Amino acid sequence: MIDDGRPLFQQIAEQIEGSIIDGSLPEDGQVPSTNELAAFHRINPATAAKGLNQLVGEGILYKKRGIGMFVTVGARDALRFRRREAFARQYIEPLVMEADRLQISLDELKSRLDDRKADR
Protein backbone atom coordinates (compact mmCIF):
# COMPACT_ATOMS: atom_id res chain seq x y z
CA MET A 1 0.00 0.00 0.00
CA ILE A 2 2.80 2.40 0.79
CA ASP A 3 4.83 2.49 -2.36
CA ASP A 4 4.53 5.53 -4.59
CA GLY A 5 6.63 8.67 -4.78
CA ARG A 6 4.53 10.72 -2.37
CA PRO A 7 5.78 11.33 1.17
CA LEU A 8 5.07 8.43 3.53
CA PHE A 9 3.28 10.60 6.09
CA GLN A 10 0.87 11.73 3.37
CA GLN A 11 0.18 8.12 2.38
CA ILE A 12 -0.49 7.23 6.03
CA ALA A 13 -2.94 10.14 6.32
CA GLU A 14 -4.71 9.10 3.10
CA GLN A 15 -5.01 5.49 4.26
CA ILE A 16 -6.62 6.64 7.50
CA GLU A 17 -8.93 8.91 5.51
CA GLY A 18 -9.91 5.94 3.34
CA SER A 19 -10.69 3.88 6.44
CA ILE A 20 -12.87 6.69 7.77
CA ILE A 21 -14.70 7.03 4.44
CA ASP A 22 -15.36 3.28 4.13
CA GLY A 23 -16.51 3.09 7.75
CA SER A 24 -13.81 0.77 9.09
CA LEU A 25 -12.74 3.65 11.38
CA PRO A 26 -16.03 5.00 12.79
CA GLU A 27 -16.57 8.53 14.02
CA ASP A 28 -15.51 8.83 17.67
CA GLY A 29 -13.57 5.58 17.19
CA GLN A 30 -9.94 5.30 18.18
CA VAL A 31 -7.35 5.17 15.40
CA PRO A 32 -4.22 3.00 15.56
CA SER A 33 -1.43 4.53 17.61
CA THR A 34 1.72 6.01 16.15
CA ASN A 35 3.68 2.94 17.20
CA GLU A 36 1.10 0.54 15.78
CA LEU A 37 1.15 2.34 12.43
CA ALA A 38 4.94 2.47 12.43
CA ALA A 39 5.27 -1.24 13.19
CA PHE A 40 2.63 -2.27 10.66
CA HIS A 41 4.12 -0.21 7.82
CA ARG A 42 7.74 -0.63 8.97
CA ILE A 43 8.34 3.10 9.08
CA ASN A 44 9.75 5.54 11.60
CA PRO A 45 7.24 6.44 14.36
CA ALA A 46 7.92 10.14 13.66
CA THR A 47 6.67 9.62 10.10
CA ALA A 48 3.48 7.95 11.34
CA ALA A 49 3.02 10.75 13.88
CA LYS A 50 3.36 13.35 11.13
CA GLY A 51 0.54 11.69 9.17
CA LEU A 52 -1.70 11.57 12.24
CA ASN A 53 -0.89 15.15 13.20
CA GLN A 54 -1.75 16.32 9.70
CA LEU A 55 -5.24 14.89 10.21
CA VAL A 56 -5.48 16.50 13.65
CA GLY A 57 -4.58 19.83 12.06
CA GLU A 58 -7.32 19.35 9.47
CA GLY A 59 -9.90 18.55 12.15
CA ILE A 60 -10.33 14.95 10.97
CA LEU A 61 -8.87 13.47 14.17
CA TYR A 62 -8.72 14.75 17.73
CA LYS A 63 -6.48 13.84 20.64
CA LYS A 64 -7.53 12.59 24.05
CA ARG A 65 -4.57 13.23 26.27
CA GLY A 66 -3.03 10.01 27.53
CA ILE A 67 -5.50 7.85 25.60
CA GLY A 68 -4.90 8.33 21.88
CA MET A 69 -6.41 9.83 18.76
CA PHE A 70 -9.99 9.52 17.66
CA VAL A 71 -12.07 10.26 14.56
CA THR A 72 -13.92 13.56 14.80
CA VAL A 73 -17.71 13.45 14.48
CA GLY A 74 -18.53 14.71 10.98
CA ALA A 75 -15.15 13.65 9.57
CA ARG A 76 -16.64 11.10 7.19
CA ASP A 77 -18.93 13.64 5.52
CA ALA A 78 -16.15 16.24 5.40
CA LEU A 79 -13.77 13.77 3.75
CA ARG A 80 -16.38 12.63 1.24
CA PHE A 81 -17.08 16.24 0.29
CA ARG A 82 -13.37 17.00 -0.09
CA ARG A 83 -12.72 13.87 -2.16
CA ARG A 84 -15.74 14.54 -4.39
CA GLU A 85 -14.45 18.03 -5.10
CA ALA A 86 -10.98 16.67 -5.87
CA PHE A 87 -12.52 13.96 -8.08
CA ALA A 88 -14.41 16.59 -10.07
CA ARG A 89 -11.26 18.67 -10.58
CA GLN A 90 -9.02 15.75 -11.42
CA TYR A 91 -11.33 13.64 -13.58
CA ILE A 92 -14.65 15.23 -14.50
CA GLU A 93 -13.40 18.63 -15.67
CA PRO A 94 -10.83 17.12 -18.09
CA LEU A 95 -13.42 14.58 -19.25
CA VAL A 96 -15.95 17.29 -20.08
CA MET A 97 -13.31 19.40 -21.84
CA GLU A 98 -12.24 16.47 -24.02
CA ALA A 99 -15.87 15.53 -24.72
CA ASP A 100 -16.45 19.11 -25.90
CA ARG A 101 -13.41 18.92 -28.19
CA LEU A 102 -14.70 15.67 -29.67
CA GLN A 103 -18.27 17.01 -29.86
CA ILE A 104 -19.60 14.25 -27.64
CA SER A 105 -23.00 15.29 -26.33
CA LEU A 106 -23.85 15.19 -22.66
CA ASP A 107 -26.39 12.44 -23.37
CA GLU A 108 -23.78 10.32 -25.15
CA LEU A 109 -21.27 10.93 -22.38
CA LYS A 110 -23.82 9.87 -19.75
CA SER A 111 -24.70 6.80 -21.80
CA ARG A 112 -21.04 5.79 -22.05
CA LEU A 113 -20.57 6.27 -18.31
CA ASP A 114 -23.68 4.19 -17.61
CA ASP A 115 -22.36 1.44 -19.90
CA ARG A 116 -18.99 1.39 -18.12
CA LYS A 117 -20.63 1.27 -14.72
CA ALA A 118 -22.94 -1.56 -15.82
CA ASP A 119 -19.91 -3.56 -16.99
CA ARG A 120 -18.41 -3.54 -13.49
Task: Give residue spans per PLM region.
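Gly/Ser/Thr-rich beta-alpha loop segments that engage phosphate groups in nucleotides
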Residues: P7, N53, G68-F70
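Short glycine- and Lys/Arg-enriched binding-loop motifs that mark or flank ligand-binding interfaces
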Residues: S19, S24-L25, T47, Y62-K64
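Extreme N-terminal segment that seeds HTH/winged-HTH DNA-binding domains in transcriptional regulators
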Residues: M1-V31, N35-E36, R80-R82, A86-R120
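N-terminal helix-turn-helix
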Residues: Q30-K63
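Short alpha-helical linear motifs
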Residues: Q54-E58, G74, E108-L109
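Enrichment for repetitive, rod-forming helical segments
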Residues: A13, G57, F70-T72, Y91
